[in-house]
Amino acid sequence: MASNVTNKTDPRSMNSRVFIGNLNTLVVKKSDVEAIFSKYGKIVGCSVHKGFAFVQYVNERNARAAVAGEDGRMIAGQVLDINLAAEPKVNRGKAGVKRSAAEMYGSSFDLDYDFQRDYYDRMYSYPARVPPPPPIARAVVPSKRQRVSGNTSRRGKSGFNSKSGQRGSSSKSVKGDDLQAIKKELTQIKQKVDSLLESLEKIEKEQSKQADLSFSSPVEMKNEKSEEEQSSASVKKDETNVKMESEAGADDSAEEGDLLDDDDNEDRGDDQLELKDDEKEPEEGEDDRDSANGEDDS
């Protein structure tokens, strides 16, 4: 396997270096690139980056043969854009236009790939005979610092502790303010909820009162009707009693009148009899007198 060194700046190395653009590095790996380009000559170095790769040949003839043979080839659904690193394409035209697999192989062989634009054109614009871009910077491991004397270390620790304490206090104050604001909001919400509950209780009480009134009203009406009926019945009874008493009094008065009439008639009869007796007595006296006169005459 070739090395990863593809950033030499000497003219010979630059003229024998091939740039491979629009490469689907999610699918194509370094071993695949070496297998494809090793047939054009010995590969000294190969580096694969995101969207592109570099292949370092021994001489310029092998590099030009690789460019002529592989430029425009489709690998993993993307058309490769290959040229010498020292001689980038000036008039690319529509080099970054996406083309489907159906255009390359016909409508019967349609691959669903999202073609990317030429990473080389977007990221780098090299004039002729310009060194390639530097490789991706590796993470630099910082060297260990020498320990300082105990006093300075203590001061540093104390300073760090003071800074951390200040940060902690500021964060605590911020948290305290946030907590107070949250408490205020919660108290407001609680007050609103309490007022709503009170209003609901009032509404329920009013509804219960109305329901009680609606239930009690027919009973009261019935009681009133029964009382009225009882009073009317008692009045009727009183009227009948009065009528009966009046009729009984009339009968008594009639009987008394009849009795009085009878007494009057009896008194009148007695008076008439007495008068008759009185009339008879003088007649008898006259008769006695007449009889006496007759005797005298004889």
From Swiss-Prot:
Annotated region described as Disordered, given as residue ranges: 131-177, 204-298
Coiled-coil regions listed: 176-211
Residues found modified as N6-acetyllysine: K163
Compositionally biased tracts (Basic and acidic residues): 235-246, 270-279
Modified residues (N-acetylalanine): A2
UniProt motif Nuclear localization signal: location: 142-148
PTM entry text: Phosphorylated on Ser-253 and Ser-291 in resting cells.
Domain RRM residue range list: 16-87
Modified residues (Phosphoserine): S108, S149, S153, S214, S216, S217, S226, S231, S232, S234, S246, S253, S291, S298
GO cellular component terms, A-Z: actin cytoskeleton; catalytic step 2 spliceosome; cytosol; nucleoplasmic periphery of the nuclear pore complex; nucleus; pronucleus; protein-containing complex; spliceosomal complex
Protein name from the UniProt record: Heterogeneous nuclear ribonucleoprotein C
Organism expressing this protein natively: Rattus norvegicus (Rat)
Taxonomic path: Eukaryota, Metazoa, Chordata, Craniata, Vertebrata
Gene of this entry: Hnrnpc
